[in-house]
Amino acid sequence: MSRVGKKPVTVPAGVTATVDGQNVKIKGAKGELSFRVPDLVEVSHADGAISVQPRSQTKEARAMWGLSRAQVANLIEGVTKGFEKKLEINGVGYRAAVAGKVLKLSLGYSHDVEYEIPAGITITTPRPVEIIVAGIDKQRVGQIAAEIREYRGPEPYKGKGVKYSDEFIFRKEGKKK
């Protein structure tokens, strides 16, 4: 039984939630998000809370139960607080800068890497070695942060590259003579 799915998601003041069949629409101060709940679970909205129940007790339905409840909770958190991922750049000459709707990364290649910032996402660089990806959709924020990190992932010898700010890089020892 899903321990996550059992708890109903409370809808805070200032947030409107509408459930139309399998579609959940959440509207808040930061924007509007929607999610289609899988057919294996049913969703209901009552008394200022959204609850999710499995239609059957199959393993697949129980898995979708917890997933759907977590997705709805993420929608509510996204339209109220938003999400952000912080990235750090380590390496001599490695830097980032935002120019209009483009993130320019100097990562040791013969050319600068240009990443076009998608709509609904804000990318800021408080310092040349720090990138903050923010938005209301948790999945998109994480995906974009992963795409930026992928341009030059951290290497294990000197730790050069782009890494998440809370990520620990296991260091390897170099060759011994």
Curated annotation (Swiss-Prot):
PROSITE patterns the record matches: RIBOSOMAL_L6_1 (PS00525)
Example of a GO biological process term: cytoplasmic translation
UniProt-recorded Gene Ontology molecular function terms: rRNA binding; structural constituent of ribosome
Keywords for this protein: Ribonucleoprotein, Ribosomal protein, RNA-binding, rRNA-binding
Transmembrane segments: none
Cellular-component GO terms for this entry: cytosolic large ribosomal subunit
Function, as annotated: This protein binds to the 23S rRNA, and is important in its secondary structure. It is located near the subunit interface in the base of the L7/L12 stalk, and near the tRNA binding site of the peptidyltransferase center.
Cross-referenced HAMAP family: Ribosomal_uL6_B
Summary of subunit composition and partner proteins: Part of the 50S ribosomal subunit.
Family membership noted in the UniProt record: Belongs to the universal ribosomal protein uL6 family.
Protein name per the record: Large ribosomal subunit protein uL6
The species this protein was found in: Methylobacterium sp. (strain 4-46)
